[in-house]
UniProtKB/Swiss-Prot annotation:
A motif (GXGXXG motif) lies at residues 316-321. The C-terminal residues 567 to 606 are required for homodimerization, as well as the interactions with ATG3, ATG8 and ATG12; and the C-terminal 17 residues are required for the ATG8 lipidation. The GxGxxG motif is important for the function, possibly through binding with ATP. E1-like activating enzyme involved in the 2 ubiquitin-like systems required for cytoplasm to vacuole transport (Cvt) and autophagy. Activates ATG12 for its conjugation with ATG5 and ATG8 for its conjugation with phosphatidylethanolamine. Both systems are needed for the ATG8 association to Cvt vesicles and autophagosomes membranes. Autophagy is essential for maintenance of amino acid levels and protein synthesis under nitrogen starvation. This is Ubiquitin-like modifier-activating enzyme ATG7. It is found in: Cytoplasm; Preautophagosomal structure.
């Protein structure tokens, strides 16, 4: 009895949330603006089809081709991820699937019949809102106007020769030539007696819709009166059908296969992962988002990992320390430590962004660290309340001051970059020497009323100067016998923001490999707010520098605290060690010679 051949839907997709997490990562780090098709893979257990459709499961590992497995077959698909939601919406879905159907037809005509089964996903990833839009299709095609009829059908036993032989083949489609299973190549299709197909459907006498793909290719390669297909299934419903094809007179291709959404409509699906994700993880990814977007187009070679992995030590948790830490966070730095010996005063919160009114009276370093964690929970931040020993300030409590020195040195050893952000000039001396001794990056920022200085200290390689290289006197006590306006940092409020941002930008630029994608890395930047002007300049190291002189470095390395204690009690010992004393003596001697006039010398005027 002749009857029309009906077809069951071909597939159903199951997209795990891990797939979208991996898509987010690949989009940010690898794909960027590249919207070319990307390969996807899913594994099919050909002996375990339990539903009436093929289950296409996509997970985080679907972007990598799995290893071959004799029990499974790898089905390759493709992802087309659009860069904007408008492109996703405006994609002509009918034209898209028609083009893909035409491609699959050509593969079947030229290569192997197994290549006519594939799937395609179009998508858009909103990485800021963690919302993903997607639509999957498995093209099934036929000649426009074609009809299919079954003229005979019979059940195939699961233990039949053809079933047993086909199970051993790790394919979905094969040919039978002289009773032997063969590959479904174009040449074999022209001479085979029948085609064997691992059917996805379990409906009685109703095969999967991709059967149309088989019949279309086969009829084009080998026109004949009837076509015999063995639909082998994992249950007892396997059957063999003899089919008549009427392709009609229309040569164009008719393609269908878009998946219906949860409401049973032909429309895209969407998933919002924000509610499923840990808020801390969302924040962690969001911080990196804008940074990684730099690599898409503006600065593709920027080294973000080098910045992220840099451990920053901020000596001073005042106005500069607060702003420097915020800019470091914005650049993705994950390890920031604070050092300060003071507490939050009532004048601080309006100028120092990490403190509130409720923090007044509490230790600055600790509160700054806690505030940073509230802003970004993934940051590794600690606060240390210690007093940095100051050259020229005699020792008053040797036990405590020695502990502070040792703690400071340990902190400098364990960090990559040291920011000097303190008020007093003499506070910067010991960290400068320790930074040079342990070969650390040292960034200095200092404020005037309407000016600022940002500089990076030199090292043995670049021979650039440090904060003290222009001095002919070692720093001494600058805090005693000072009026209030001399003891407080009196500066225009905006100066600190300018200096802090440029200090971090100087570091970030310095960390980049050569050639530097962010531009030049100056030695020092001087800003003048009264003229709204900045000047970049470079100065060489000074051999008699009180902080960078080799004798001073060696003395600290060999004697440690004993040398520091001596420098605290008498700053002139550093001048002698560095050679500054001799420079001063020579200058005084030269000055005396210039003004050494004899009594007989006369000034001539006229």
């Amino acid at each position: 009895m002749v009857s029309d051949l009906k077809f069951a839907p071909s597939f159903q997709s199951f997209v795990d949330s891990s797939f979208f997490h991996e898509l987010s990562r690949l989009k940010l780090d690898i794909f960027k603006l590249d919207s070319d098709e990307k390969a996807l893979y899913t594994q099919l257990d050909l002996n375990q089809f339990t539903s009436n459709v093929l289950a296409i499961s996509l997970r985080d590992d679907s972007f990598q081709k799995p290893d071959n497995d004799e029990h499974n077959i790898i089905l390759k698909g493709y992802l087309l991820n659009f860069n904007t939601i408008e492109l996703f919406k405006n994609c002509n879905k009918i034209q898209f699937i028609k083009e893909k159907g035409q491609e699959l037809l050509q593969r079947g005509l030229e290569n192997d019949l197994n290549e006519i089964i594939s799937f395609y996903m179009i998508s858009f990833a909103d990485l800021k809102k963690y919302k993903f839009y997607y639509w999957i299709c498995m093209p099934s095609f036929q000649s426009d106007g074609a009809t299919y009829q079954i003229i005979s059908s019979k059940v195939i036993a699961s233990d039949s020769d053809i079933s047993v032989s086909f199970i051993k083949q790790n394919v979905i489609i094969a040919c039978v030539i002289s009773g032997v299973i063969q590959k479904a190549t174009p040449d074999n299709l022209k001479v085979c007696e029948k085609v064997v197909f691992k059917d996805f459907s379990h409906l009685k006498d109703i095969p999967s819709a991709v059967t149309k793909n088989i019949l279309t290719v086969w009829s084009k390669l080998s026109p004949r009166e009837t076509y015999t297909i063995c639909f082998l299934r994992s249950d007892e419903s396997s059957f063999e059908a003899e089919i008549i094809i009427n392709n009609g007179n229309n040569p164009s291709l008719k393609v269908s296969g878009w998946e219906k959404n949860g409401l049973g409509k032909l429309a895209p699906k969407s998933i919002d992962l924000s509610s499923l994700m840990d808020p801390v993880k969302i924040a962690d990814q969001a911080v990196d988002l804008n940074l990684k977007l730099m690599k898409w187009r503006i600065a593709p070679k920027i080294d973000l990992d080098g910045i992220r992995n840099t451990k920053a030590l901020l000596l001073g948790s005042g106005t500069l320390g607060c702003y420097v830490s915020r800019v470091l966070l914005a650049w993705g730095v994950r390890h920031i430590s604070f050092v300060d010996n003071s507490t939050v005063s009532f004048s601080n919160p309006v100028r120092q962004s990490l403190y509130n009114f409720e923090d007044c009276g509490k230790p600055k370093a600790q509160i700054a660290s806690e505030a940073l964690k509230r802003i970004f929970p993934s940051v590794e931040s600690s606060g240390y309340q210690l007093e940095i020993p100051m050259i020229g300030h005699p020792v008053t409590n040797e036990k405590k001051q020695r502990q502070d020195y040792e703690a400071l040195e340990d902190l400098i050893k364990s960090h990559d970059v040291i920011f000097l952000l303190m008020d007093a000039r003499e506070t910067r001396w010991l960290p400068s020497v320790l930074g040079r001794l342990h070969n650390k990056i040292v960034i200095n920022a200092a404020l005037g009323f309407d000016s600022y200085l940002v500089m990076r200290h030199g090292n043995d390689d670049d021979k650039l100067g440090c904060y003290f290289c222009n001095d002919i006197l070692a720093p001494s006590d600058s805090l005693t016998d000072r009026t209030l306006d001399q003891m407080c940092t009196v500066t225009r409020p905006g100066v600190a923001l300018l200096a802090a941002s440029q200090a971090v930008e100087l570091l970030v630029t310095y960390l980049q490999p050569t050639p530097n994608v962010l531009g030049t890395s100056p030695h020092q930047i001087r800003g003048f707010l009264n003229e709204f002007k900045t000047v970049s300049q470079s100065t060489p190291e000074y051999e008699h520098c009180c902080a960078g002189n080799k004798s001073v470095i060696s003395a600290l390395q060999e004697n440690g605290w004993n040398f520091v204690r001596q420098a605290l009690d008498d700053y002139k010992c550093v001048e002698k060690l560095s050679g500054l004393s001799k420079v001063q003596e020579e200058a005084e001697l030269a000055l005396e010679e210039d003004f050494d006039f004899s009594e007989d010398d006369e000034f001539v005027t006229g």
